[in-house]
Amino acid sequence: MKNIKNNIICISGPSGVGKTTIAKLLTCILEQEAIVISGDDSHKWSRKSKNWERYTHLDPSANNLEEEKEQLNNLKNNINIKRRHYNHNTGLFDPAKEISPVQNIIYEGLHTLYDDQFRNLCDIGIYVDTDEELKIAWKLKRDLKERGYTKKQVYEAIKKRTDDEKKYILPQKKHADIVIKFSFSESGVKMKYKTKSDKHNDMLEKLSLLYEEKKKFVDICHRVSKESSLVQNSGGNISVKFNGNLLITSSGCRLSKVGILKNCCFVKKTNGNIIGEPKPSMEMGSHIHLNKSVIHTHPVNLLAILCSMEAKEIINKIYKDYKFEFLDYITPGKEVENCVAKRNKKSNVLFLKNHGLFVTSSSLESCLQITKEINSLATEYLKNNKKEEMNKNSHKALGHLFPDSVVLPKINEQINNEIYKMIIESGLTPCFLTKEDQAILLNLEEEKYRIKMESKNEDNLCRH
């Protein structure tokens, strides 16, 4: 039997140009399984070593390149390797872990096309080239927020590395099969590419389309996050389908923190593999059954209606011009998914009692527009039906009105009280979640994971 070797895709370029972005996007579009290996793992010393006073990371002699070649060769030939990981958060090396080869090995770093031995191991060579102004902006953003550097340290590192970049990194460009360039444009950061062979065009076209789709996705997430009446804290989730695959926000993440590679997951249609961290939203199953684009929110004014005994009657009245379904309260996650799967496919709006709103459409822009319209109608209804003004000290809710107030009570107590106040002032009857409902929520593994992620996000917010 012929020995089938794995593909190695080498991605090279200066520091902070988007090599990791390209690597992670490739894992999403390649049909066969792919893993990313970071060239930074080859650094000889930890961050605090005095050796870095004499060398830069761009100097080949400061990296274990011969060991890199041996490990790449093993992965190419289906041999497991043990590899330590350079942790940029700590500046130290994490303990070595075993890595099993897959069909596509994406090797990204500073020296991946440095010499003939690397280039001979490589099946596709990619060089990432970025406008200097953009490169500095990206490097500042990454190193300040993720790697713990000061602004002064970042600029000093850029200055110190200039000569080594010209000597060791830039010459690799001429050996690449593909050159990808990021640059500023009127519509934001654009990605362009040049290739020596037409055989890569299909892959590059998918890569470019996914990058543009992710930019739109991030933009919508950030815009929704600014609508405080639609989502609060880590509530709500958004998704869009790309070539049948699902791009969805992560569990416990704040929409304002979603990025091209952060707080979102890519779920492959072929094998269900999930690319990205943290795990996808627990409502992923519902998103899969809905149309191309989905926005799930917890609009406060709408919740004041949905958390009342009169919810169904009012929803039928004020949203009679919409194609919608009303679902009585069911546990988030799998139970909601089962109901969504059975819905009337003509319905593009789902009202979930004591929970929130799903809007699905052909585009995220359309979803957002409909979501705003629905929230506006709820706001108008409450305004027109206000019966009394409650004393500020007397509107503490007598129970939990929606799931997030149960799972994350500390950060949602004020919202729960505000919803209760609006219900009473509108002459409606509050519908609290039962103790049984609350116990089920607190025992869901998906909710436990979300609590963990929310706690982690809170810690990060405090540090910054």
Stretches found by the model and what they are:
Residues 1-3, 100, 163-208:
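NTP-dependent small-molecule kinase module
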Residues 204-464:
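Glycine-rich flexible loops
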Residues 35, 44-90, 104:
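Conserved nucleotide-sensing/catalytic segment adjacent to the nucleotide-binding pocket
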Residues 15:
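The conserved Walker
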Residues 22, 26:
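Hydrophobic positions on the alpha1 helix immediately C-terminal to the Walker A/P-loop
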Residues 94-145:
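ATP-dependent NMP and nucleoside kinases share a basic, alpha-helical "lid"
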Residues 19:
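Conserved lysine of the Walker
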